[in-house]
Amino acid sequence: MKFFKTHSDHELKRIKKTVKQILELQPEYAQLSDEQLKSKTEEFKQRLKEESLNDLLPEAYAAIREADKRVLGMEPFPVQIMGGIIMSQGRVAEMCTGEGKTLVCTLPAYLNALTGKGVHVVTVNDYLAKRDSDQMGQVYEWMGLSCGCITQDMEAPDRKVQYAKDITYITNNELGFDYLRDNMAVRKPQMVQRGLHFCIIDEVDSVLIDEARTPLIISGTKFCSKGKYLAFDRFAKMLERGETTELNKIDYISGEMGTDSGDYVADEKDNNLFLTEAGVAKIEEMFHIGNLSDPENLSIQHGMVNALRANALMHKDKDYVVRDDEVLLVDTFTGRIMPGRRFSDGMHQALEAKEGVSIRPENKTLATISFQNFFNKYERKCGMTGTGQTEEQEFRDIYGMDVIHIPTNRPIIRKDLNDSVYKTKAEKYAAIVKRVRKIHKKGQPILVGTETIEVSEILSEMLLKKGIAHNVLNAKNPEMEAAIVAKAGQFGAVTIATNMAGRGTDIKLDSRSKEAGGLYVIGTERSESRRVDNQLRGRSGRQGDPGVSKFFISLEDDLLRLFGSEKYISIFENLGIKDGMPIEHRMLSRSVEKAQKKVEENHFASRKSLLEYDQVNNDQREIIYRERLKVLNGEDIHSDILYMIDSIIDRKVIESYEGNEISAKLLNDNLLPIIPLPTIGDADTKEDDFVKSLHTSAKVLYQKKEALMEQAYPNEHMMREIERTLLLKTVDKYWQQQIDDMDQLRQGIHMVSYGQKDPKLEYRLQGFSMFNAMNDNIQEDTVQLLYQVAPVIHDN
């Protein structure tokens, strides 16, 4: 029972009038012929010249709703119309599994496509992008709009064609990588995107929250010694893992210090790792260095922390799998392998050294962006998900989107049972198998959701021994994914799925399954996120179907082990509970949710911190990409070149002062290698307007160069083209180096906190200084190369 109205209740009340308008138009639109209904698209486009999208919304939604009915045989319900309106307002619509989010998408996609600027519908994998574009594309094209789809294997020319469509279905990864590639193009025709206008993000929490900690990176290889990674790994395995003593508030206020044991502390709660004083001393001894924190030893410190992190915090068959002499990353939120994705900064090499597989060359980052900064580039964005309210603060703070819960079309009748808590994992697994046997006997379909591949394989083996036929869906067999999910709701089906939460396909029940009680969902442990658990529960009870959900957890599970398993152990002991027997109480479930909330807060803080650092990089990236685009668009940059010449002269004159006078020798050494002017004498520097005369002389010299090129290549505007080409190449060369330098700065910036400085402020200040130095280098290299340009003389 609710005593108070929620934010969602208030917002839904506001849009009920619009929903009513749309429903009242239904009889009128139902009487239109197919041709009359199709002609509405062109009518709306013309009206947009005088009216806003908001003015058109009721009629446009009524039109596409009628088209959905005629083409697909599906008409959006009033609650689905609500979801469509919320999304058109640039918000997140939280809609339960099975409530037809794919159909809802047609409403805001159609409306926003009328502008002609393009709509991107973002999905989490190629399969869903292709499936949804094939199905929903029928409606858009029937209404006179074009619809396309971009998948991983598509070549650039085809991508350009698909981006030119009114509505384009694509994954978040492909969208981000195309943006980066476009900003590395050396010719305008190589660019495939046409701007970031409006996007609809399906599974928006997965894209904007779960994947926000992993930036998109385009990389090349850089030379490095493989032996150093093996050395780091060998030394890391020799160091002793310790524990930190947490302080209570009174100790902290009185100035007591926590004590650290061992050589390093790996905190799985916060996914942090740091060296103790003893560990620092051992590393200094191992590598025969004086001070590990000295700038020249930064690579050793970074390599050792990577090796320790690989050994202490990253787990095989959970964070990654080893296959065919290769370490492959696993998306921990979906259980899918991410082919082609590698950690940067030596982290992947640390894992390869740990697992004893071939060590591949380290990546050099050529271009990078976080999903947070990428999606914030859209003029307007919205999203839909089954579970968004637990992350509402993050959506609002980072993306400026609030989350509105849309009621279900039919009431949810699924039973969510209390958690069963066991002492050990072995007891828990035995209890799960026992429960599966019991439920399976009556034919009720069962879905067992696991956090790792390892657990899915343990349970699979146990079920086989009991003679229970089942399907296994994990990161090792993604090809069979859709087929397995399609069968999971059949009578008598048993399915084990690694992190089923992120699968994106509905489980539909047959009639016998409904009679048997619907889908029985078993969670094998609580996830770090309440949202992921809710996604697993939400697989059952779709569209008013019956169903059950229950979590089996143990005191050895990561979440309980890290957040207060001692408390539960004492409860077991005080109650005298025998081995193999569980505790079940709502209080325990609430305690687990409290622990999850703490982890979520830690992750939010981590993502927010990442964004604050990345914002510095983003400000720099914006400037570089804006200047590159000017060049690619064919804008005349001749005036920019002349400005660079003046800037270089001014800078070199300032650098050549000795006391109160300009040193002619220093100025010749500093300036003439860049701008080949006649040698400057001491007397010249004393003249009035000396700097002005240098500006004039340099430009006259440049004009002579231009005249020479014009004579050799008449009517070809050769010098303008050379200016563009050389500037682009120089910008790219130094920008890639800047990315690398900023990354090195980020790795070591925490050391400044020992000097009572704010790391984030120092990162911004030092990054700004490095960016200015990069700009100077770009100017000097570009101008130097332009003065060296000469026509090619061909023998007749």
Feature locations, PLM:
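Extended, charged helical/alpha-beta scaffold domains that provide interaction surfaces
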Residues: 321-328, 334-341, 543-544, 556-559, ...
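Conserved P-loop NTPase motor core
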Residues: 1-576, 625-626, 643, 647
